[in-house]
From Swiss-Prot:
The lineage of its organism: Bacteria, Bacillati, Bacillota, Clostridia, Eubacteriales. The keyword Translocase does not apply. GO terms for cellular component: cytoplasm. Involved in peptide bond synthesis. Stimulates efficient translation and peptide-bond synthesis on native or reconstituted 70S ribosomes in vitro. Probably functions indirectly by altering the affinity of the ribosome for aminoacyl-tRNA, thus increasing their reactivity as acceptors for peptidyl transferase. This is Elongation factor P. SMART domains: EFP, Elong-fact-P_C.
Length: 186
């Protein structure tokens, strides 16, 4: 059992026969009245997002989630295909299931697929990925009074903010959890 006060982003639990993943949460302690936890939950089966408020002492059953490392192969008009390295089985996943991770995945990269009762419901990209910059504005000399950032488009079409000294064609390391530039890769 897990209490509502212990909920964090990414926590998966069962409530009223449904399985939810915490998208966002806020622990509120008002000046008057009892504390509560405001959450934004995504149903892992249907994909529906709801906002729910819990008493911090409320208990719910933690869902048993299986994680499996799989290789991203390719995509077509409607699905993204991943392959299990042990069985060579390929599974198609919809955009809703891969939306947070796909902007950091290139073909043949590995990602963690989350399963609930044998059904895939979510994809996690590796924490750090190295991607090439395909387009960005050139840095202007003298424009360095502070930590100035500029947008850069990566080979996966993700856009991240990078420092002025980073140029098109360079490879950078990106933190996929925050979408932030970490460093240049030599």
């Amino acid at each position: 059992m897990i209490s509502a006060g212990d909920l964090r982003k990414g926590t998966t639990f069962e409530l009223d026969g449904q399985v939810y993943n915490v998208v966002d949460f806020l622990h509120v302690k008002p000046g008057k009245g009892a504390a509560f936890v405001r959450t934004k939950l995504k149903n892992v089966i249907t994909g529906a997002v709801t906002e729910t408020t819990f008493n911090p002492t409320a208990k719910m059953q933690e869902a048993v989630i299986e994680r499996k490392e799989m290789q991203y192969l390719y995509s077509d008009e409607s699905f993204y295909y991943f392959m299990d390295q042990e069985t060579y089985e390929q599974i198609p996943l919809s955009f809703d299931q891969v939306e947070n991770a796909i902007k950091y995945l290139k073909e043949n990269m590995f990602a963690t697929i989350k399963f609930y009762k044998g059904e895939a419901f979510s994809v996690e990209a590796p924490n750090f990925v190295e991607l090439k910059i395909v387009s960005c504005e050139p840095g202007v000399k003298g424009n360095t009074t502070s930590n100035v950032m500029k947008p850069a488009t990566l080979e996966t079409n993700a856009v991240v903010q990078v420092p002025l000294f980073v140029n098109e064609g360079e490879t950078i390391r990106v933190d996929t959890r925050t979408g932030e530039y970490m460093e240049r890769v030599q």
